[in-house]
A protein has these predicted regions:
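Acidic, low-complexity intrinsically disordered segments
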Residues: 1-194
Length: 194
């Protein structure tokens, strides 16, 4: 049982991990009345997960894993593995959650461009990291994530696949507990395309 845990700090403005090369952006427009109004409008109107997280979800589901997606950590629900997408804009919040998970003897892997170029604080917090495109690692069934203790702290140098070889993204799992939105395009659910 695997949880894709996409954590964010509490903020009055929108934070997205899927922009700026997946390092993320924070839309803090200032302290004036119009700025605060715009911040609230954007925060309530646009929200979606990072595409690499959705693709990893699809790879894991295709291989038969029980995968869940959440933006909230519930330690009462037990998972064999916690996978967190990394970002520069949520770095401190991610580290806090990693330390909490490791303290509770949970297995943690961090994915994404930010951890690829800035791994040390994640390693120091007790997580294992994937350097590079995480969907490429998870696509290969030879990579046994269930044998977590046998994985190196830094997972890298794995085979790359063409996009046509990858499985479909795991949007159905994402939609179980979370609805991505882009209200400027309508009130229904939205799938982002970068």
């Amino acid at each position: 049982k695997i949880l894709l845990l996409d954590v964010y700090p509490k903020s009055p403005y929108r934070i997205s991990k899927d922009q700026n090369g997946a390092y993320g952006t924070a839309n803090n427009y200032g302290t004036g009345f119009v700025s605060k109004l715009l911040q609230r409008l954007v925060k309530s109107s646009i929200d979606f997960p990072s595409l690499f997280t959705v693709q990893v979800c699809g790879e894991l589901k295709y291989q038969g894993h029980d995968v869940k997606f959440s933006k909230e950590l519930d330690l009462n629900e037990n998972f064999d593995l916690y996978i967190l997408p990394s970002s520069i804009v949520c770095h401190e919040t991610e580290i806090k959650h990693i330390k909490l998970l490791v303290k509770n003897k949970k297995n943690v892997i961090i994915i994404g461009p930010f951890v690829t170029s800035n791994p040390q604080s994640y390693l120091d917090a007790g997580a294992k990291i994937i350097k590079g495109e995480p969907e490429m690692f998870f696509h290969n069934p030879i990579n046994k994530i269930i044998d977590f203790e046998k994985l190196p702290s830094i997972i890298e140098n794995f085979q790359n696949y063409s996009l046509d070889e990858l499985y479909f993204p795991g949007w159905e799992t994402i939609f179980e507990n979370y609805i991505p939105k882009m209200k400027f395009l309508g009130n229904g659910p939205t799938i982002n395309i970068n």
